[in-house]
A protein has these predicted regions:
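Glycosyltransferase-associated regions of secretory-pathway enzymes
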Residues: 1-24, 42-210
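Small-residue hinge/turn detector
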Residues: 25-37
Length: 210
């Protein structure tokens, strides 16, 4: 990060988890604040150009986050299936709300040396509060391919099965739960496939990726 962030002087190679993950999030937030742009998880497969999502996200509130399935025990106390996730976020250059998020992450890095922030869902709760205040835009899960057209959660069983999945017409991509694939023994076979094998597999995910 030091090549694109003049004030970044932390060597992440010598930092251990979970501090390393929080510092990486902080650095990415600073990149977005400095240059503007959009952050996507590596397991998000795009169907189309995302410029319309970016423009809609920054139009009124300057910063936006995606609504993704809560798989980490994080989020609000009412245990919503979906919650705001900074795995997918973006902003305009010099966004003041992103600066607030940076300050928030710096506080976490200064005080939290465990995985507690993941389980409590501090980031999700921070974002949710600002979404409710209409200061932050939430990109709906249907648009991000985490629910079908009827609002049903796209489970790993559905994605790696061969029954038809009816996505929303406005879906710009599909979010692949990569950590679930690695965690669940029954589906680790998919992680071992080559790119070509994954695309030609008899799965709905393979069909949507081609």
């Amino acid at each position: 990060f030091k090549n694109i962030l003049p004030d970044w002087n932390i060597n992440l190679d010598i930092v251990s988890e979970p501090i390393k993950d929080n510092l990486r999030k902080l650095a990415l937030a600073k990149v977005l604040h400095t240059y503007g742009g959009m952050l996507l998880p590596s397991s998000f497969a795009c169907f189309t150009d995302l410029i319309s999502i970016y423009n809609a996200g920054v139009q009124n509130n300057c910063m936006f986050v995606g609504e993704l399935l809560n798989r980490d025990g994080a989020g609000p106390e009412d245990k919503e299936d979906f919650c705001p996730s900074t795995k997918m976020m973006g902003c305009a250059k010099d966004c003041p709300l992103m600066k607030e998020y940076i300050n928030f992450m710096e506080l976490i890095n200064a005080t939290d040396y465990t995985d507690e922030s993941v389980f409590i869902g501090e980031e999700s709760l921070w974002c949710l509060e600002r979404v409710r205040e209409n200061r932050m835009t939430l990109i709906p899960s249907e648009i991000l391919g985490s629910r079908d057209v009827n609002g049903k959660i796209l489970t790993l069983e559905m994605l790696l099965g061969n029954s038809y999945i009816d996505l929303d017409d406005k879906a710009v991509g599909i979010y692949i739960p990569d950590q679930d694939i690695l965690r669940r023994t029954a589906y680790q076979w998919f992680a071992r496939l080559s790119a070509g094998q994954a695309l030609s597999s008899n799965t709905m995910l393979g069909k949507y990726l081609t």
